[in-house]
Amino acid sequence: MQLVTAAEMQTIDNYTVETIGMPQDVLIERAAMSVIDVIGAGHFNLDHILVLAGLGNNGADGVAISRLLYAQGFNVSLQFVGNVTRAKDSVKRQLDIIEKYGLVRAEKSDFNEATLIIDAIFGTGLNNLLPEGLQKMIKAANHIEKTVIAVDTPTGIDATTGEVRGAALKAHTTVTFGYNKIGLTQRVGGYLSGNVIVKDIGLLTPQDFNFSLPDKENSPSVATS
């Protein structure tokens, strides 16, 4: 299986959107649907699903996931981590949609009430320490040992090195897109990512793209679809 760095994944994403012309919102919808597929195929307690969303494209994935779950009749809470007014346009577009669905954002959520947490705070773009307040929240969530599905990359994990950027939310399952990330296979990142599932959401790679690592045999701990 081909592994990529965070920078390589960003290049592939940019190529798909800017050169090929694939709308970002289409990729977000496909990413969200792939997570819904994993939720439906797994044995998760879906009594109360808490979606934690950040301010970037990973957060936009989270908003779309919450909408799809809500439309299917699940008890879902959507909580933003950060000031929504500073969110990317992709997030704001998703917010406009969920408002029309009638899904109201939660100002604050109790982790103890959640039976499943969807981690859509930070994806592969994380390259600095998490803010102190977010580190505290993550440590509290880890302490109560809730089942977590991470979207693309567990929050706090460097997608290239596998290092923890201050604190990291421990995932039962990580649904990552396009290619598996090096950081999800190395160091503590491999442990905190849990079961990694690679989903094809339509990202296109340039024919002359030079990967930093050679293609490897598929690992038994990684599923692809």
UniProtKB/Swiss-Prot annotation:
GO terms for molecular function: metal ion binding; mRNA binding; NAD(P)HX epimerase activity; nucleotide binding. It comes from the Bacteria. It is an enzyme of class 5 (isomerase). (6S)-NADPHX binds at residues 57-61, 123-129, 152. Binds 1 potassium ion per subunit. InterPro entries: YjeF_N_dom, YjeF_N_dom_sf. Keywords: Isomerase, Metal-binding, NAD, NADP, Nucleotide-binding, Potassium. GO terms for cellular component: P-body. Its cofactor is K(+). K(+) binds at residues 58, 119, 155. The keyword Isomerase applies. Residues 9-209 form the YjeF N-terminal domain. It catalyses: (6R)-NADHX = (6S)-NADHX; (6R)-NADPHX = (6S)-NADPHX. Gene3D superfamilies: YjeF N-terminal domain. Its EC number is 5.1.99.6. NCBIfam families: yjeF_nterm. Catalyzes the epimerization of the S- and R-forms of NAD(P)HX, a damaged form of NAD(P)H that is a result of enzymatic or heat-dependent hydration. This is a prerequisite for the S-specific NAD(P)H-hydrate dehydratase to allow the repair of both epimers of NAD(P)HX. This is NAD(P)H-hydrate epimerase. It comes from Leuconostoc kimchii (strain IMSNU 11154 / KCTC 2386 / IH25). The lineage of its organism: Bacteria, Bacillati, Bacillota, Bacilli, Lactobacillales.
